[in-house]
Amino acid sequence: MPRRRVVAKREVLPDPKFGNVTLAKFMNHVMISGKKSVAERIVYGALDLVKEKLNKDPLEVFDEALENIAPLVEVKSRRVGGATYQVPVEVRPSRREALAMRWLVEYSRNRGEKSMPQRLAGELIDASQNKGGAVKKREDVHRMAEANKAFSHFRF
């Protein structure tokens, strides 16, 4: 966090197949060790599987899944006196998107299916239907914020 000026956000180029910027960002989250072509293969494979299983536009399912995963509020630790409080704060839109993608990838990797495209497709389908690990994570975060609503006057 620089003191002098705000650093401009880098522009992400849209993905080659669908021309979608959000999907390109998601591929960057899936990518490990800079292997973008592998990440593209995984994401496109997962979207093909989603299309096969649901007979719906895979991008619509993807957007719906992200919307169902993205948290509205989260808790941040704030030290007041000798105590540390979990203070609920609203999540800004860019962080909502980033958290949703991060959780989607994390819970896809923890699934039991054989290949990563199958795991990702399964988690996407579950998330679009308000099920699965990533949606449960969002519910847990919301529950924490609700439980600590009393400390919301300790704003940042």
Swiss-Prot record:
One of its GO terms (cellular component) is small ribosomal subunit. It comes from the Bacteria. Part of the 30S ribosomal subunit. Contacts proteins S9 and S11. This is Small ribosomal subunit protein uS7. InterPro entries: Ribosomal_uS7, Ribosomal_uS7_bac/org-type, Ribosomal_uS7_CS, Ribosomal_uS7_dom, Ribosomal_uS7_dom_sf. One of its GO terms (biological process) is translation. Belongs to the universal ribosomal protein uS7 family. One of the primary rRNA binding proteins, it binds directly to 16S rRNA where it nucleates assembly of the head domain of the 30S subunit. Is located at the subunit interface close to the decoding center, probably blocks exit of the E-site tRNA. CDD domains: uS7_Bacteria. Transmembrane segments: none annotated. Keywords: Ribonucleoprotein, Ribosomal protein, RNA-binding, rRNA-binding, tRNA-binding. One of its GO terms (molecular function) is tRNA binding. The keyword DNA damage does not apply.
